[in-house]
Amino acid sequence: MLLSKQQVITCDDILLSLCDSVTDVLSTATGDKISYTPMIQKINNTTLRPDIGTFVLFTGTFSGMVVLNFPKETAMELYTCYMKLMGLSDSDLATNYTSEEVSNTLGELLNQMVGNFTAKVSTTLNGRIHQSQPKMLALPHQVEININMTLDHPEVSRITFFTNGGNVFYLELAMDHTEFKLARELTPAERPLTPEEIMAEAGLV
């Protein structure tokens, strides 16, 4: 995404960029079609919910936290699709969502999703963002854990995602209220290359 001087990037734009990273990484990693609702839900705080709650912190140009909550059916669908695409047979797969292998797989996927997001946003905003290692918890149905990052003016949002198998999972993003706008035109060295320019540099066009 290239910025113009008239364009303002808001927290919602950053959230949608994160959602695109989630769908791109998960769809590629699992071969499953992942989509998300066009509705952004504003909430008061981030919460780890059953059956598996995962989160990652990021700091730098802006700070925040990403939370993903997976019902057990969704966790097993994504885990199974990912491992089968890696070449594992049914007999080699974990059969319970509480298995450490399932949690580790979801953590690895979350790391890839947030890594894709931070790289993309760092380029777009000419900034730098660092992410923590993902943490995850398998939670019983009666347990929810509020998990908050210290922010001056928090904006917290939730988006619902859908898998090809008809299951759902939920993404929550907490970050300080912020806006970005271009103060001066980017020089060619600073400006992200367009797909056409990348192909031209590689001699493909």
Where on the chain are the PLM-derived regions?
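Composition-driven recognition of glycine/serine/threonine/acidic- and proline-rich low-complexity segments
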Residues: L2-V205
